[in-house]
């Protein structure tokens, strides 16, 4: 099979990442740090009016974070941002999404699984009726069902990690690890129990220097040093 042509990554100009403090915004920060890219941070927070300003709405009518500006390109959705950054700036040693067709398909399969089954269908339901119950109302049965569903979906992760890979796709860190780890951390914060192998995996992934830098960049303004 012919291998995809290796292209030189675009150098790019000014990069601005809007959004801090959430499990979704940290994904974009993490990818930027893993790729060694410089960028400016706009410490916009969710649900405090920051995303409803005329300035931000002009960038995205969705009024959601994270949002990446890369020169004249504006892109939202954390998984799309991570994939774009890898495709545009990734080098052989730090690319987050493989170039080969099968490797890319497997990575994106994991990414789409995490975003749809773990994030949107499970964890965000818990958030809506937990942290945001003053908006969406309390729904204990929905929260319980979401917790059970999350744990059920995590079985495929447990089986994969049962073969003792360092990362979810083996020995290489990818975008799938960024998305999966942020969901595991999110679940643990909600006191959702997960397998020991999952906890150990998450410790390995979050021990990366790029994660520590992302945590600092993702901190809300009041939590920043000197802030």
Label every PLM stretch briefly:
Residues 114-207:
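GST-like fold's C-terminal all-alpha helical module
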